C-alpha cells in the first residue's frame, strides 16, 4: 500500500509539473524578457539567476520576506543566498528539472518586489 501511495504522489508531482511546462516558443520569449531584466541562464542546468543589491540588510531582508510569502503561496521556492545587502536568487522547478511557467511567474513577482523596495 505504501509503495502504491508513493507511486501516486510521484505521479501527481509529475502531472502538476507537466501543466507548468513551457513550450519552446514560450521559453524563448520568457528567456528574452528575463534577460532584458538582468536575469541570466545557468550553463550547468536549466535555471535562471540574478543578484539584487539593496541599500542595507533591512531592505534586503524585507525583499526576501515578500518573496518568501509569494513563494509559499505558489508552493514554489527559490534557491537563494543573502549577505548583508545582496540577495542572489536561482529559479528552477526541481520536480521536473527545468524552467517552467512557475519560475517565470515568480521571477516577474521578484522584479516587482525589488522595484518597490
UniProtKB/Swiss-Prot annotation:
Name positions with the PTM N6-succinyllysine. 101, 105, 112
MF terms per GO, please?
Answer: 4-alpha-hydroxytetrahydrobiopterin dehydratase activity
The enzyme class is lyase
Q: Which residues carry this modification: N6-acetyllysine?
A: 101, 105, 112
| EC number of this enzyme | 4.2.1.96
Q: Which UniProt keywords apply?
A: Acetylation, Lyase, Tetrahydrobiopterin biosynthesis
- Subunit structure and binding partners: Homotetramer. Interacts with DYRK1B.
- NCBIfam families in alphabetical order: PRK00823.1-3
What the protein does comes down to:
Involved in tetrahydrobiopterin biosynthesis. Seems to both prevent the formation of 7-pterins and accelerate the formation of quinonoid-BH2. Regulates the dimerization of homeodomain protein HNF-1-alpha and enhances its transcriptional activity.
Query: What family does this belong to?
Result: Belongs to the pterin-4-alpha-carbinolamine dehydratase family.
Q: What is this protein called?
A: Pterin-4-alpha-carbinolamine dehydratase 2
- Lineage, opening ranks: Eukaryota, Metazoa, Chordata, Craniata, Vertebrata
- What gene is this protein a product of? PCBD2
Amino acid at each position: 500500500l505504501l509503495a502504491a501511495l508513493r507511486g501516486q504522489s510521484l505521479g501527481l508531482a509529475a502531472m502538476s509539473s507537466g501543466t507548468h511546462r513551457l513550450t519552446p516558443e514560450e521559453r524563448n520569449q520568457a528567456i528574452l524578457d528575463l534577460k532584458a531584466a538582468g536575469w541570466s541562464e545557468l550553463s550547468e542546468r536549466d535555471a535562471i539567476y540574478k543578484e539584487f543589491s539593496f541599500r542595507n540588510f533591512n531592505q534586503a531582508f524585507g525583499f526576501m520576506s515578500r518573496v518568501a510569502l509569494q513563494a509559499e503561496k505558489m508552493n514554489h521556492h527559490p534557491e537563494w543566498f543573502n549577505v548583508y545587502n545582496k540577495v542572489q536568487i536561482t529559479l528552477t522547478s526541481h520536480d521536473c528539472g527545468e524552467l517552467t511557467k512557475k519560475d517565470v511567474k515568480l521571477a516577474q513577482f521578484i522584479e516587482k518586489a525589488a522595484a518597490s523596495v
